[in-house]
């Protein structure tokens, strides 16, 4: 009786594993499209036009006490 009960339990477990393995592959992505990683492209620009606006970066902003010539060298190395 115990061997029969064990075989039903193992059969149930194996069948659950098979069913779950069949359904696990439906939602995964197979590859990344080159559009998604293209240079100079804002993601989701076609779906939401609000995301298409790029915010310009201030290249000349330095923290207080820094100069363009030293680039905070004195603060890093305590000169």
Curated annotation (Swiss-Prot):
It is found in: Secreted. The keyword Glycoprotein applies. Cell signaling peptide that may regulate plant stress, growth, and development. Mediates a rapid alkalinization of extracellular space by mediating a transient increase in the cytoplasmic Ca(2+) concentration leading to a calcium-dependent signaling events through a cell surface receptor and a concomitant activation of some intracellular mitogen-activated protein kinases. Glycans are attached at residue 68. Belongs to the plant rapid alkalinization factor (RALF) family. Keywords: Disulfide bond, Glycoprotein, Hormone, Secreted, Signal. One of its GO terms (molecular function) is hormone activity. The keyword Secreted applies. One of its GO terms (cellular component) is extracellular region. GO terms for biological process: calcium-mediated signaling; regulation of growth. This is Protein RALF-like 35. PANTHER family: PROTEIN RALF-LIKE 15-RELATED, PROTEIN RALF-LIKE 16-RELATED.
């Amino acid at each position: 009786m115990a061997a029969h009960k064990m075989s039903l339990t193992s059969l149930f477990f194996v069948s659950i594993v098979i069913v779950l393995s069949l359904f696990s592959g439906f939602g995964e992505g197979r590859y990344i499209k080159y559009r998604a990683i293209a240079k100079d492209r804002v993601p989701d620009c076609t779906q939401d036009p609000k995301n298409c606006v790029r915010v310009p970066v201030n290249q000349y902003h330095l923290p207080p006490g820094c100069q363009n010539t030293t680039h905070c060298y004195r603060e890093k190395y305590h000169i």
